[in-house]
């Protein structure tokens, strides 16, 4: 399984060398930038939370991944269309849905595939219908999240934030129905940390959903997603970062135990005495 993951990753990287070279320049520029804007996902949330996730989780934690707005198309709460569609007149990626949902689904599927290859107990969910009027319908993201969170699953919903000036940036909006854990903390370290009571407490987090805003759907991030030459590597890079954060939260790297230093006996050892008998140079007086 680990071999399959490595081969898949090598294939993606080999097909995208030119793009990755550009990425390297972007990363170097970001490192020198006082704002520290991420070269892939852009700025982190401008509203920063102060919570800390400390609860340890089981190494066999079950993870459920949802695509935000999967059941609310052509109705209130359909998600953002992105700057390309709204401001630049571009055609939607799929006329049945807002661009945000199109990309949410792509990231969800890539994350589930990567996570499984890397040993995570992870699965995705799709309501099977783009518009479900009743939030209490058992097929909606909210209903499924409430049930699975009560069973102890970690429920993560993928989102892209609105474009400027409406959006805030990348980051995790954590659940409100439980104590925050190491996975929440790891995702916040990787993407940013929204206030726990963002907008007074959203419906998803009240039902056990951690909302992961990948970034504002605009600029370089949106351009790389829309460009067929860079689309796959961008999706995989985002999914890879999420998978890394999930793994680190579930199986944190422990500091290696200090090796016991050998005890040094007092006085000269026998080997030293024997050498001195045969090597007068060892008897140097200062």
Labelled PLM ranges:
Residues 2-286:
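Catalytic-site microenvironment of enzymes
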């Amino acid at each position: 399984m680990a071999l399959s993951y490595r081969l898949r990753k090598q294939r993606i990287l080999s097909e995208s060398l030119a793009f990755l070279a550009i990425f390297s320049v972007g990363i170097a520029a970001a490192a020198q930038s006082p704002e520290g804007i991420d070269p892939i996902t852009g700025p982190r949330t401008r509203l920063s939370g102060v919570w800390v996730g400390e609860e340890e989780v089981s190494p066999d934690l079950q993870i459920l991944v949802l695509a935000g707005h999967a059941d609310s198309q052509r109705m209130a709460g359909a998600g953002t269309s992105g700057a390309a569609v709204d401001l630049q007149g571009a055609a939607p990626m799929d006329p049945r849905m807002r661009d945000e949902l199109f990309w949410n689904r792509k990231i969800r599927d890539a994350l589930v595939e990567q996570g499984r290859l890397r040993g995570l107990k992870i699965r995705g969910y799709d309501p099977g219908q783009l518009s479900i009027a009743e939030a209490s319908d058992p097929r909606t993201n909210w209903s499924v999240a409430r049930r699975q969170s009560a069973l102890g699953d970690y429920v993560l919903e993928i989102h892209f934030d609105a474009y400027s000036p409406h959006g805030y940036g990348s980051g995790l909006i954590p659940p409100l129905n439980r104590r925050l854990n190491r996975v929440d903390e790891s995702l916040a370290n990787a993407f940013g940390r929204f206030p726990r009571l963002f907008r007074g407490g959203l419906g998803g987090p009240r039902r056990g959903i951690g909302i992961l805003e990948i970034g504002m759907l605009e600029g370089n991030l949106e351009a790389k997603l829309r460009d067929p030459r860079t689309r796959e590597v961008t999706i995989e890079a985002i999914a890879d970062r999420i998978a890394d954060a999930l793994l680190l939260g579930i199986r944190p790297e422990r500091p290696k135990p200090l090796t016991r230093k050998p005890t040094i006996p007092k006085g000269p050892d026998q080997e030293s005495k024997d050498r001195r008998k045969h090597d007068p140079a060892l008897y140097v007086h200062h």
